């Protein structure tokens, strides 16, 4: 703890943050004395709040008003005084499992559904990045004959995405049907042996020497096909962020000013390239201090002035990664006012990330 606080100061800071989160009103010593069992008088609480203000953890928005937490006060609360409501995690994961079925809907539909559920539960803006396509691993490949001389290569990745491309077999008029089918079977087995469990970036790195000589006449065609498939797997705007919960956050008093709302909307709609590195903490190092929850899931919290983007300095961003094995492939985040119930939002973000890791991130 960078700021040394005695036990009473910790209790008063904890109560002040909790009360302000609940009421959105500046907090006075009388309210804390009446509503929290601090076992000291209102006068003593007032003195302690004064000391916390001198330490930069509280401030007075107006001379006659009570006090509210500063960004530093929230940071001390989050890192040292808060107890996460971990009972939420199991309920959230069960809710996501009940409402989303990744085997019957698309990957993007799963992510959009998760974003909507998280926004509803948190009451804030939810941000979920699409998986980086080229980090996906190949689950299986298959060559399927679709016309007399045309074959489709189908590639299915571990995050339920499908890629396909057509190839010409050339003149097959004098080739027996059974031989063509056998060649396709051998080539399919070769591709699966070479590429299953490897990333899409490795599509062009096959050891063609292992392909039997009689089938190597298809090698150049397959190589070109795979390179084309790799090129098309690099989506335009691959740093896309799915956003939900705009209507929820507009109900917060911090966003009552039209200019504040317009600033946030501009960031979310037009400046995603700036926002993406902040939510994807696994790709960009920052000075923000992570906290470790009981499951050892790292959750990053950027509070107010810790945010490098000016439009977000009235906000907090809570984010975590979802993974394939130990490799991050995307991120989940909640964006709201600094006055948010961190003890609830952090487990919600963590549980959503865990669900996506379990559902979408299993190795091939």
Curated annotation (Swiss-Prot):
Q: Which gene is transcribed and translated to give this protein?
A: hrcA
**Presence of keyword ATP-binding:** no
Keywords linked to the UniProt accession: Repressor, Stress response, Transcription, Transcription regulation
Recorded superkingdom: Bacteria
Which family does the record assign? Answer: Belongs to the HrcA family.
- Which GO molecular function terms does the record list? DNA binding
> Signal peptide location in the record?
none
Protein name in the entry: Heat-inducible transcription repressor HrcA
Note the PANTHER family from the entry: HEAT-INDUCIBLE TRANSCRIPTION REPRESSOR HRCA
GO BP, sorted A to Z: negative regulation of DNA-templated transcription
Biological role stated in the UniProt entry = Negative regulator of class I heat shock genes (grpE-dnaK-dnaJ and groELS operons). Prevents heat-shock induction of these operons.
């Amino acid at each position: 703890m960078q700021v040394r606080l005695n036990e009473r100061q910790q209790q008063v800071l904890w109560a002040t943050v909790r009360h302000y989160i609940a009421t959105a009103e500046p907090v006075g010593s009388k309210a804390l004395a009446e509503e929290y069992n601090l076992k000291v008088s209102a006068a003593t609480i007032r003195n302690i709040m004064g000391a916390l203000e001198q330490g930069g953890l509280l401030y007075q928005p107006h001379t006659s008003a009570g006090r509210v937490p500063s960004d530093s006060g929230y940071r001390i609360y989050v890192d040292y005084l808060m107890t996460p409501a971990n009972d939420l995690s199991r309920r959230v994961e069960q809710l996501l499992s009940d409402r989303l079925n990744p085997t019957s809907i698309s990957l993007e539909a799963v992510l959009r559904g998760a974003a909507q559920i998280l926004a509803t539960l948190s009451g804030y803006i939810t941000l979920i990045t699409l998986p980086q396509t080229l980090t996906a691993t190949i689950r299986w490949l298959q060559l399927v004959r679709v016309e007399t001389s045309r074959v489709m290569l189908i590639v299915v990745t571990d995050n339920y995405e499908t890629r396909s491309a057509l190839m010409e077999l050339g003149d097959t008029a004098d080739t027996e049907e059974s031989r063509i089918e056998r060649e396709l079977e051998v080539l399919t087995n070769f591709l699966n042996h070479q590429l299953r469990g490897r990333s899409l970036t490795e599509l062009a790195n096959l050891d063609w020497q292992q392909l039997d000589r009689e089938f190597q006449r298809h090698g150049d065609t397959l190589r070109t096909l795979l390179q084309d498939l790799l090129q098309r797997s690099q989506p335009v705007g691959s740093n896309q962020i799915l956003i939900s919960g705009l209507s929820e956050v507009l109900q917060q008093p911090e966003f009552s000013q039209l200019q504040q709302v317009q600033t946030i909307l501009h960031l979310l709609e037009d400046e995603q390239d700036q926002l993406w590195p902040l939510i994807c903490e696994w790709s960009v190092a920052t000075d923000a201090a992570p906290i470790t929850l009981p499951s050892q899931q790292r959750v990053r919290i950027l509070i107010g002035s810790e945010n490098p983007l000016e439009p977000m300095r009235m906000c907090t961003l809570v984010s975590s990664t979802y993974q394939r094995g130990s490799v991050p492939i995307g991120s989940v985040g909640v964006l709201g006012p600094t006055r948010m119930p961190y003890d609830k939002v952090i487990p919600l973000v963590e549980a959503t990330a865990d669900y996506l890791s379990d559902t979408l991130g299993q190795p091939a």
